[in-house]
A protein has these predicted regions:
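Compositionally biased, charged N-terminal/linker segments
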Residues: 1-61, 91-115
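Short beta-strand-centered aromatic/proline hotspots
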Residues: 62-72
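Short conserved micro-motifs at the rims of enzyme active sites and ligand-binding pockets
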Residues: 66, 76-77, 97-98
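Short, solvent-exposed secondary-structure boundary/capping segments
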Residues: 72-87
């Protein structure tokens, strides 16, 4: 099947995974990490418990990161927002999965799963 006829596979998270999904705009692959990692309104205590951060574009997981640390940004334009530092999860099965059911009609770009 191709195009709009493709069946989207829903994300079925591992129960042990603590996931933060963040919606990012359509970006070039080389910019995806930077777009995913910073300037989020999150509860930093809760965010630090996350085992995975998923980059979401149009409801689909584009990349998965393992966060190493979260901190409040030093950027004066984004006071009170958080950013993480992490690495790509090379063993993930989440890429290409649909997360639309987790967001519903929510406009919030951040979604917590299993947290």
């Amino acid at each position: 099947m191709t195009g709009n006829n493709m069946i989207k596979k829903a994300l079925m998270p591992n129960p042990e995974d603590r996931i933060i999904c963040v919606k990012v705009g359509k970006v070039k692959r080389e910019n995806l990490y930077e777009m995913t990692r910073k300037y989020w309104k999150v509860d930093i205590t809760r965010a630090r418990k996350a085992t995975h951060v998923l980059a979401i574009v149009n409801g689909i997981v584009q990349e998965v990161y393992i966060p190493v640390d979260w901190k409040y940004t030093d950027d004066p334009k984004h006071i009170g927002r958080c950013e993480f530092f992490g690495t790509e999860d090379e063993h993930t099965t989440y890429i290409g999965k649909d997360v639309s059911d987790f967001y519903g009609k929510s406009q919030n770009p951040v979604k917590y799963i299993n947290m």
